[in-house]
C-alpha cells in the first residue's frame, strides 16, 4: 500500500478529519513539526512538503546552533519531507478531529537526509543486515506526573491518604493504590496508545512518589521501537494534560527522588531465525560467547556513548548513590545495580538490558549506540569485564564520565561510535551539545542569589 493509499484509507474511516499534525523528532528527541489543514494532506502524501533542514539540529530550547551549516548563517534552507509509512494515526486530545503523521526528510538528491537521527539509526541497522542479523528490541521509560498548580515550586504528584487531605509518604514502589487512583489516566493512555499503534505494555508505580514506568512490547524493527518510544512520550504528556496534570521525562526532575531512565532490551537472531544469545554452562559466565562479546562491545563503547545517553545538563543529576543509576560499565544477571543487566528469563528468551540512558535521551541515537556497541563486540570478539554475580553486593568506583563536559570530551576523543554515527553527524552533535552547555552555564539561577547574594 502506497502512502497515498494509506491516507485515502484513513480518510474513509475518518471523514470528519480537519487537522493533520506533522511530527519531526529533532537531535534531542524533541518533537517539532507543522500543523496542516486536511485539504493539504493529499499533496503531502503524494509530493511531500518543504521543511527547514535545521529542524533536526536545534538545541533543547529550540535555538539554532551558532556557526553551523543549515542554519541562520546560510539562509536556513529547506529539504523535502515525506510521511513515514504506517505512522498516520488519530489524535484524541484535540478539540477538533485531528491526526498525526511522522515525517522523514530527503536531500536534494532524494537521498535520506544525513542529519536526521532516524536515518542515523537506519544506517546502523544496515550493518546488522549485512551480517544477516536481526535485532528484537523493546524500550522501557520512566516518568513523573506533576500535579500541584497552587504550589510555588514544581512537585511530583503525591497520592492522598484516603478520607483525608493528607499526602501519603514514602516511595510506595509497586503501589497498587497509586495505579488505582490514576485509573482514568492510565485507561485513557492505554486507549490513546491503541489508537496510535503504540504497543504499551506493563505499567508500575516506581521508586519515588509520582514516578511510573511503562514498557513497550518488543518488535523486530529497532527503528519502529524508537518511533514507539518517541510517540509514547508525547502520548503520556498530552494525556496528563487532559487530567490537569503535567508529565516529565527529565532524567532528574527532583533532587531527593529517583531519576528516570530509558532501558533498552535487545535480543538477536541470525539468518535462519536461531537465537544468538543463549545460556551456556560451559562458559564461566553461564552465557554463550555471543552474549559475552555483545556485552564486551557495550562496555567498551559506554564511556564515549554517555554524551548520547545523557544529552543535557539535567541528565547528570541522575548519578547519585542508591538510585540504580549507572556509574561504571559493569554487567551480570538479574542485578539492577548494573549498567548492563541480563534479566531473568527462560533459556529461549535470553536478552540484554542496557540501563545507561536517561528517559530524556533521543531514542534513535540511544538505539543506534546500543546496536553499535553490540555490533562492535560481536565483530571484534570483545571480551566483557568481570561479571557481577546475582545478589552480589557491590560498591563500584565511578569510571564513567558523569559530568556533562567530561562526557562530551569522551565522545570527542572516542574512536568507535563515530564510525557508526558518521563523523559529520558526530561533529554536529558535539557542537550542538557544547553550545547548549555554554548557554546553560551562562545563566544566573535563583540558587546563585540564595547562596551568594547576602554573604558575598
What is each of the regions a protein language model found here?
Residues 136-144, 161-176, 196-215, 247-264, ...:
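Core alpha/beta catalytic barrel or barrel-like domain that forms the active/cofactor pocket
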Residues 173, 177-200, 214-221, 233-249, ...:
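Accessory "access/gating" subregions that flank catalytic or transport cores
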Residues 1-202, 224-228, 396-456:
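ATP/Mg2+-dependent ligation/transfer catalytic cores
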Residues 211, 216, 222-295:
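Acidic, glycine-rich loop-and-beta core segments that form the ion-binding/anion-interacting portion
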Residues 90-97, 135-136, 203-208, 257, ...:
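Short glycine/proline-enriched loop/turn "hinge" motifs that connect secondary-structure elements
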Residues 26-28, 106-112, 178, 218-225, ...:
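A generic structural motif
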Residues 101-107, 212-219, 266, 354:
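Short, hydrophobic beta-strand segments
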Residues 2-4, 238, 245-246, 269-326, ...:
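Catalytic-core signal marking the mid-to-C-terminal active-site face
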Amino acid at each position: 500500500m502506497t502512502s497515498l493509499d494509506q491516507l485515502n484509507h484513513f480518510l474513509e474511516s475518518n471523514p470528519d478529519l480537519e487537522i493533520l499534525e506533522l511530527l519531526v523528532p529533532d537531535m534531542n528527541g524533541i518533537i517539532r513539526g507543522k500543523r496542516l489543514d486536511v485539504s493539504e494532506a493529499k499533496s503531502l502524501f503524494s509530493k511531500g512538503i518543504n521543511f527547514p533542514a535545521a529542524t533536526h539540529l536545534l538545541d533543547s530550547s529550540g535555538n539554532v546552533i551558532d556557526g553551523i551549516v543549515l542554519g541562520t548563517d546560510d539562509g536556513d534552507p529547506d529539504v523535502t519531507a515525506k510521511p513515514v509509512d504506517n505512522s498516520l494515526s488519530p489524535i484524541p486530545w484535540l478539540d477538533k478531529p485531528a491526526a498525526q503523521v511522522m515525517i522523514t526528510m530527503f536531500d536534494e538528491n532524494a537521498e535520506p537526509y544525513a542529519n536526521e537521527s532516524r536515518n542515523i539509526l537506519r544506517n546502523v541497522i544496515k550493518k546488522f543486515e549485512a551480517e544477516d542479523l536481526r535485532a528484537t528490541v523493546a524500550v522501557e521509560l520512566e516518568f513523573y506526573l506533576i500535579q500541584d498548580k497552587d504550589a510555588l515550586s514544581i512537585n511530583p504528584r503525591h497520592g492522598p491518604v484516603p478520607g483525608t487531605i493528607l499526602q501519603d509518604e514514602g516511595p510506595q514502589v509497586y503501589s497498587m493504590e497509586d495505579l488505582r487512583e490514576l485509573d482514568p489516566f492510565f485507561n485513557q493512555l492505554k486507549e490513546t496508545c491503541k489508537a496510535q499503534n503504540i504497543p504499551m505494555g506493563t505499567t508500575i508505580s516506581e521508586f519515588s512518589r509520582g514516578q511510573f514506568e511503562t514498557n513497550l512490547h518488543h518488535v523486530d524493527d529497532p527503528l519502529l521501537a524508537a518511533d514507539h518510544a518517541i510517540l509514547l512520550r508525547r502520548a503520556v504528556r498530552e494525556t496528563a494534560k487532559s487530567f490537569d496534570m503535567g508529565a516529565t521525562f527529565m532524567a532528574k526532575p527532583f533532587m531527593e527522588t529517583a531519576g528516570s531512565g530509558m532501558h533498552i532490551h535487545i535480543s538477536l537472531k541470525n539468518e535462519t531465525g536461531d537465537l544468538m544469545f543463549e545460556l551456556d554452562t560451559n562458559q564461566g559466565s553461564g552465557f554463550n560467547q555471543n552474549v559475552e562479546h555483545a556485552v564486551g562491545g557495550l562496555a567498551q563503547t559506554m564511556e564515549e556513548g554517555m554524551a548520547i545517553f545523557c544529552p543535557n545538563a539535567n541528565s547528570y543529576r541522575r548519578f547519585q548513590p542508591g538510585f540504580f543509576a549507572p556509574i561504571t560499565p559493569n554487567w551480570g544477571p538479574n542485578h539492577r545495580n548494573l549498567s548492563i543487566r541480563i534479566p531473568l528469563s527462560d533459556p529461549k528468551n535470553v536478552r540484554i538490558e542496557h540501563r545507561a540512558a536517561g528517559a530524556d535521551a533521543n531514542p534513535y541515537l540511544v538505539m543506534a549506540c546500543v546496536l553499535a556497541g553490540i555490533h562492535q563486540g560481536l565483530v571484534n570478539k570483545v571480551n566483557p569485564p568481570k561479571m557481577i554475580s546475582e545478589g552480589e553486593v557491590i560498591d563500584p568506583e565511578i569510571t564513567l564520565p558523569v559530568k556533562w563536559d567530561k562526557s562530551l570530551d569522551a565522545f570527542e576523543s572516542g574512536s568507535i561510535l563515530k564510525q557508526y554515527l558518521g563523523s559529520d553527524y558526530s561533529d554536529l552533535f558535539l557542537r550542538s551539545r557544547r553550545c547548549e552547555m555554554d548557554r546553560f552555564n551562562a545563566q544566573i539561577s535563583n540558587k546563585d542569589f540564595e547562596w551568594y547574594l547576602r554573604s558575598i
